[in-house]
């Protein structure tokens, strides 16, 4: 039996992820009038552009919902965001600046917590506003069915009758007005925005064109640092971790991780930290482009990685990065709770994050311009005396030790030279001036 419904299931309980915007408002009213029993669920994800969460369920009831619930998802969202930082679960980057997977993290939390709330109310049909071209339709599908295997999916935007009757925002606005709801369309922006406490995504419309960029975006979590009239003062900030958990900012200890994240966003946002312009591959392998904000995630990530590099050895750091790239892609694909993702995540949290205790002091300037001023940890394996250019007592190794170590390298150098000669003989490589490798003499003995 298919889990996707192509038409409205009249007379049945249907849950809708309700934002209070024009699209979901029109969809709720339309489904009600067509005979469905509509239940509205709103996720409080700490969206920085949402002024009054409590008003959203009231609005849903006015439009005919049988029941409307506001589900506070912020604590779980921050929990997942910190887990992503601990595991370095970020696979999309440009020039070393990462996209912090804030939308995929939000979908993992929304998709599980809203469907759990629906299940409590006896609602086993779920609708949301994701379109067939995007990532969210698959993310919500996976998380919804993981949470409730009896779930069926109904999306008004995949229902041809809904599309024929309310195919655009102008039609939706007219529909709401004709039924006594003076719903005016908001002014059209040059792009669309989706946000949560961890970050904001700006995409589509004008941002689909690569000759439009960050300068057309009005940040909602930070400042337009690229503008000459935007005053940004340098600021020192200290971040403290205990066993991989961020616990203090500028000496202020937080017992509530949500409050800590609000403060991290405020600090990073004052500088525009964490904004990036990325071209990425969607789940369906088509490329899309987005402008991202994540001031708090960026601040914590920078401090965390500084401690990681000062505490762990090279092989551990290498594996952390490899696993993080893989885990980031799984997260992006809506597989954050799949077994392979849990394995990678648990590995990082247990063997990398647990050792990360200490403080990092940064100087934030404009955008992603910052300096690291100090790093302190009881677990640092960085020991400057090991490599000091000055004479030190009880040196860990001597010139004679290094001579012996270099002599041992002759074994693999000889093997490598022989291989290069073999490749040159077979035509795989050319040697000599102007080629990738210099003229090498054959090993004569």
Curated annotation (Swiss-Prot):
Reaction catalysis annotation: L-citrulline + L-aspartate + ATP = 2-(N(omega)-L-arginino)succinate + AMP + diphosphate + H(+)
Binding-site residues, ATP: 17-25, 43, 129, 131, 136, 194
GO BP of this protein: argininosuccinate metabolic process; L-arginine biosynthetic process; urea cycle
Keywords of this entry: Amino-acid biosynthesis, Arginine biosynthesis, ATP-binding, Cytoplasm, Ligase, Nucleotide-binding
Keyword Ligase belongs to the record: yes
Binding residues for L-citrulline: 99, 135, 139, 192, 201, 203, 280
Family: Belongs to the argininosuccinate synthase family. Type 2 subfamily.
Subunit structure of this chain's protein: Homotetramer.
Protein name: Argininosuccinate synthase
Protein source organism: Rhodopseudomonas palustris (strain TIE-1)
Gene that encodes it: argG
